[in-house]
């Protein structure tokens, strides 16, 4: 399973995290598939590439609890929810077009 999670970098007593897409079986600071953002907890600074994150979430990547809260604060989960369910409501609102054959009157 592919997960969106934090990868710790930085010094002792000065944590800094990368938000990465990684296989769930790989250790925390191991290889990752793609870098989608960064998080600095000391300054409470979050930088996330919205398009990449939405791409991975649409493809089935599961965020960890911490990353989920960061995504919701950035409004990315709301955008994901709206994109998924706005398609369903649009198709439900469309009425099926019935193909009725009309008889043409012949006036001679």
From Swiss-Prot:
Q: Name one GO cellular component term.
A: small ribosomal subunit
Superkingdom of the organism of origin: Bacteria
Q: Where is the composition biased (Basic residues)?
A: 96-108
Q: Which UniProt keywords apply?
A: Ribonucleoprotein, Ribosomal protein
Keyword hit for Ribonucleoprotein: yes
Per the UniProt entry, the disulfide pairs are none
Region annotation (Disordered) ranges: 82-108
Q: Which GO terms describe its molecular function?
A: structural constituent of ribosome
Q: What Gene3D superfamilies does the entry give? A: 3.30.1320.10
Annotated GO biological processes are: translation
Annotated InterPro entries: Ribosomal_bS16 (IPR000307), Ribosomal_bS16_CS (IPR020592), Ribosomal_bS16_dom_sf (IPR023803)
Q: Where is the signal peptide?
A: none
* Keyword Transcription regulation attached: no
UniProt-listed NCBIfam families: S16
Stored PANTHER family: 30S RIBOSOMAL PROTEIN S16, SMALL RIBOSOMAL SUBUNIT PROTEIN BS16M
- Can you tell me which family this protein belongs to? Belongs to the bacterial ribosomal protein bS16 family.
- Recorded protein name is Small ribosomal subunit protein bS16
């Amino acid at each position: 399973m592919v997960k969106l999670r934090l990868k710790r970098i930085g010094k002792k007593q000065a944590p800094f995290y990368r938000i990465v897409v990684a296989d769930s079986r790989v250790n925390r600071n191991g290889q990752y598939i793609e870098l989608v953002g960064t998080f600095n907890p000391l300054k409470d600074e979050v930088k996330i590439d919205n398009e990449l994150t939405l791409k991975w979430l649409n493809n089935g990547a599961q965020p960890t609890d911490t990353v989920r809260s960061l995504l919701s604060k950035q409004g990315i989960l709301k955008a994901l929810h709206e994109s998924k369910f706005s398609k369903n409501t649009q198709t439900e609102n469309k009425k099926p077009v019935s193909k009725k054959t009309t008889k043409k009157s012949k006036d001679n």
